[in-house]
A protein has these predicted regions:
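Glycine/tyrosine- and acidic-biased, solvent-exposed loop/turn segments at the edges of beta-strands
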Residues: 14-136
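Sec-dependent N-terminal signal peptides
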Residues: 4-13
């Protein structure tokens, strides 16, 4: 819960995505035969939609992405990938709150907790390793 309050405070105070100062840029994630591409146009019903800070045509800084299945990530980005503090929420209400680290070109859980739909901690990661699975 402490991490959630800190993250919300940081985003509300400093984020052009959520703050009133500037909305940021909009990008859409396109899946192609040669990989994923970020483009400035798309359809939110068929492509994930990103709103936030952008550098070199990719999410970089603070931003929000909403996937077509209803999942949502709010937090830090680097070169189009989750990096730093963030929250990934699934449509069923389960979520990961913590930090992400890019390893081998892939964003991975780093330090954080995974919560069930009732807000109860189910898993904990430290330095990229799952260290605890909580019993219910």
């Amino acid at each position: 819960m402490k991490h959630l309050l800190i993250l919300i405070s940081i985003l509300l105070l400093s984020s052009p995505v959520i703050g009133n100062s500037h909305k940021g840029e909009t990008l859409y994630l396109w899946e192609t035969s040669s990989g994923s591409l970020w483009k400035g146009f798309g359809d939110k019903d068929t492509q994930p939609k990103y709103q936030g800070q952008v550098k070199d045509g990719k999410p970089n800084g603070l931003g929000v992405i909403i996937y077509t299945n209803g999942s949502k990530y709010v937090g830090g980005w680097e070169n189009g990938k989750y990096q730093g503090q963030g929250t990934y929420t699934k449509p069923d209400g389960t979520k990961y709150i913590g930090s992400w680290k890019i390893i081998g070109g892939v964003s991975s859980h780093w330090n954080g907790e995974y919560y069930d739909e009732d807000g109860i901690i189910k898993y904990k990661w430290v330095n990229g390793k799952l260290i605890k699975q909580y019993k219910t």
